[in-house]
């Protein structure tokens, strides 16, 4: 028999009844029932119940065992007594009567329990991550992650892609975040950079004559962490294709991502035909370029209903040409309590408030409060915008300060445009859309969640297309790239030479899923003269382009094929499919929010000898 096991702890069934077996694993839990010890023995594959009674030679050793001790047991497989079976356990029909027990590795007192789902502080969990990873849910997440990556590889190969590995030590490049720098011992004063993405290398692969590349690529960015972004490093499904247009990329990628989601969605519906949503439309309808399409709410421009109205705040705003008023419909949100709650939320977000209109059914009010209630409601609904002698018939009317100020005709026009009914409400944001769009998107999300309008049991995928190539940087007071500087501008060199830079769109696209950006890519700018012009508009001269992107720029001079690609965030996809909201729940050994590895003690001071070899002298710290 093998030194440690003949079977795993998830393998035994009624087929092995009567056999002598050997198992090794962790003591998941130990219970004493009337002097008989029951040990739940756990390994990577499952859990088996082990029984040790006082007649067993193993009993004396078993009495010493505590939670998370590693033990080996020999024993005989038998059926569990009738009525004690556990149908939720793969081995739940049998148990092992132990005849021999060996302690392979005792455990100190546990700083956090492995059994159960008790929440513990993140610092404790990360410092003792090896214990945390033994917990069932996290252990399962990590296994799911590996299976998802396997599925990605298999599906990419099925689409004709070939896997390559690009260098980890490379040159610094402006990918939008700070680099992690690695000092060179052999070249004093010079540094390598860890790749923020394999962007230049994958384009060089296309210029080297290969046709379809992919890899599960580690990426390193020195940026501030957040829940959906791990500090330090992350992984992406990186790909590139030659001789393609945008739709060719979509046709290759869509079945891979859809297939992976269907395989691991546990029966939840997955979008079959992905919509293509232009960037500007996504902002206008959803307030974000990564919309959660499970939320049915669509924002609309209702400026005309407030222009010249009795609500002077909005009316004066609309005298400025660029300003608009947007409405966020709230079906079923027509209660004062809900509207006040949303108003308080808006103030907590740093806004002065959130204007609203509620719609009520006057006929229902009449039944409840009589004729006087109807007259009072009618009088209030007339408002300053109604005009003398205006008569409102009983029916659905607007209520609230905005409705009182703009009058029933405008209020009814808003209701009709938004397709709302009695018991519904709408919230309003006004001003420069460029400045309020982010808040409007947050408000749409908040309304959808508060009113339980979001179907949590499905995955909605969409392409976001037609991103602006440039944006104006208020901080630097200049035009800069809005996304990937290597993307092809729509209209090519001619657009760069003749159009207002802020009007140029790029062959740039993202994949949005349930409110997250899970992939981004573009058709590449493969003509050197167009590349130089694109960077010139953003403030980089030709010499800078040659210095910073020398390898790729040189390759462009020797016959570069039209090409494009994208990168999908492995971590975010796994996070969504595992049903968690924090990336640390799907990563083996993550850092904390301060970018500290509490388990390994990184970052740490380097030894003086190491620093001397690298020709580095730490600067004195300011006091």
From Swiss-Prot:
Disulfide bonds: none annotated. It holds the Pfam family tRNA_anti-codon. Keywords: Aminoacyl-tRNA synthetase, ATP-binding, Cytoplasm, Ligase, Nucleotide-binding, Protein biosynthesis. It is found in: Cytoplasm. One of its GO terms (molecular function) is nucleic acid binding. The record marks 33, 83 as: Important for tRNA non-discrimination. Residues 199-202 are annotated as: Aspartate. It comes from the Bacteria. L-aspartate binds at residues 175, 221, 483, 524. Homodimer. This is Aspartate--tRNA(Asp/Asn) ligase.
């Amino acid at each position: 028999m093998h030194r440690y096991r003949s079977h795993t702890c998830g393998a035994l069934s009624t087929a092995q009844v009567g056999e002598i077996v050997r198992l090794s694993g962790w003591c998941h839990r130990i219970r004493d029932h009337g002097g008989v010890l029951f040990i739940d023995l756990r390994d990577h594959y499952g859990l088996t119940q082990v029984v040790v009674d006082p007649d067993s030679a193993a009993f004396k050793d078993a009495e010493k065992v505590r939670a998370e001790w590693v033990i080996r047991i020999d024993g005989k497989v038998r059926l569990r007594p009738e009525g004690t079976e556990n149908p939720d356990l793969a081995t739940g029909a049998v148990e092992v009567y132990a005849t021999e027990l060996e302690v392979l590795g005792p455990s100190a007192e546990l700083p956090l329990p492995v059994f159960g789902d008790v929440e513990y502080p993140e610092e404790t969990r990360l410092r003792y991550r090896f214990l945390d990873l033994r917990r069932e849910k996290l252990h399962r997440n990590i296994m799911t992650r590996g299976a998802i990556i396997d599925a990605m590889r298999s599906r990419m190969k099925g689409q004709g892609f070939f896997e390559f590995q690009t260098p980890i030590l490379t040159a610094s490049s402006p990918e939008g975040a700070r680099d992690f720098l690695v000092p060179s011992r052999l070249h004093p004063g010079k540094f390598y950079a860890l790749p923020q993405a394999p962007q230049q290398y994958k384009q060089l692969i296309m210029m080297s004559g290969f046709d379809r590349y992919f890899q599960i690529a580690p990426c390193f960015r020195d940026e501030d962490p957040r829940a959906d972004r791990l500090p330090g490093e992350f992984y992406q499904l990186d790909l590139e294709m030659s001789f393609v247009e945008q739709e060719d990329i979509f046709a290759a990628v869509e079945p891979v991502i859809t297939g992976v989601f269907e395989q691991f969605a546990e029966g939840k519906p997955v979008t079959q035909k992905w919509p293509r949503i232009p960037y500007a439309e996504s902002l206008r309808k959803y307030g974000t370029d990564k919309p959660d399409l499970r939320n049915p709410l669509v924002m609309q421009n209702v400026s005309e209903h407030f222009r010249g109205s009795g609500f002077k705040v909005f009316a004066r705003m609309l005298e400025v040409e660029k300003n608009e008023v947007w409405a966020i419909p709230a079906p079923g949100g027509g209660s004062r309590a809900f509207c006040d709650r949303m108003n308080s939320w808006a103030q907590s977000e740093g806004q002065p408030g959130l204007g609203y209109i509620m719609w009520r059914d006057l006929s229902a009010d009449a039944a409840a409060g009589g004729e006087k209630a109807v007259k009072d409601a009618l009088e209030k609904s007339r408002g300053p915008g109604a005009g003398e002698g205006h008569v409102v018939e009983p029916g659905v009317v607007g209520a609230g300060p905005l409705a009182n100020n703009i009058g029933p005709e405008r209020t009814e026009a808003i209701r009709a445009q938004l397709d709302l009914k009695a018991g519904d409400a709408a919230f309003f944001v006004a001003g420069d859309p460029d400045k309020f769009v982010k808040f409007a998107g947050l408000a749409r999300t908040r309304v959808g969640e508060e009113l339980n309008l979001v179907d949590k049991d499905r995955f909605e995928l969409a392409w976001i297309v037609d991103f602006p190539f440039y944006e104006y940087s208020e901080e630097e007071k200049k035009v800069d790239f809005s996304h990937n500087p290597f993307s092809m501008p729509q209209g090519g060199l001619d657009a760069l030479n003749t159009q207002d830079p802020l009007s140029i769109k790029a062959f740039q696209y993202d994949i949005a899923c349930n409110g997250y950006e899970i992939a981004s890519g573009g058709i590449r700018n493969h003509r050197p003269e167009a590349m130089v012009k694109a960077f010139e508009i953003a403030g980089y001269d030709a010499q800078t382009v040659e210095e910073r992107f020398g390898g790729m720029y040189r390759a462009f001079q020797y016959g570069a094929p039209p090409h494009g690609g994208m990168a999908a965030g492995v971590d975010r996809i796994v996070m969504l499919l595992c049903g968690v909201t924090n990336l640390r729940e799907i990563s083996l050994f993550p850092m904390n929010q301060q970018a500290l590895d509490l388990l390994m003690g990184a970052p740490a001071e380097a030894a003086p000898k190491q620093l001397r070899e690298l020709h580095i002298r730490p600067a004195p710290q300011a006091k």
